[in-house]
Amino acid sequence: MLGGISIWQLLIVLGIVILIFGTKKLRNLGSDLGGAVKGFKSAVGEEEQKKQDGEETAQHRVAHDTNEEPLDTSSKATQSSGADEKSERK
């Protein structure tokens, strides 16, 4: 069976463990272990979600950058030079 261990030997070991620790401690141990596994799964899920959000943001930036028209800086230069002329007149 399991490397030479029979079902009866496993039941005897389980009985001894229950006698030593008691069912309450084993129940607490099981719930603690279950809570740890649940916490681990949620942490992994959060990391996956952050990774997916980062990829979506990067894809959105790339799509936004490629759809953007080039800025016309010549109109800004004329507006600022006109403002300089007005301040010099005063």
Curated annotation (Swiss-Prot):
GO terms for molecular function: protein transmembrane transporter activity. Residues 42-90 are annotated as: Disordered. Its main location: membrane. Signal peptide: none annotated. Residues 72-82 have a biased composition (Polar residues). This is Sec-independent protein translocase protein TatA. Belongs to the TatA/E family. It holds the Pfam family TatA_B_E. The chain crosses the membrane at residues 1-21. GO terms for cellular component: TAT protein transport complex. InterPro entries: TatA/B/E (IPR003369), TatA/E (IPR006312). The gene is tatA. It is a single-pass membrane protein. Residues 47-67 have a biased composition (Basic and acidic residues). It is found in: Cell inner membrane. It comes from Chromohalobacter salexigens (strain ATCC BAA-138 / DSM 3043 / CIP 106854 / NCIMB 13768 / 1H11). The Tat system comprises two distinct complexes: a TatABC complex, containing multiple copies of TatA, TatB and TatC subunits, and a separate TatA complex, containing only TatA subunits. Substrates initially bind to the TatABC complex, which probably triggers association of the separate TatA complex to form the active translocon. One of its GO terms (biological process) is protein transport by the Tat complex. Keywords: Cell inner membrane, Cell membrane, Membrane, Protein transport, Translocation, Transmembrane, Transmembrane helix, Transport. Part of the twin-arginine translocation (Tat) system that transports large folded proteins containing a characteristic twin-arginine motif in their signal peptide across membranes. TatA could form the protein-conducting channel of the Tat system.
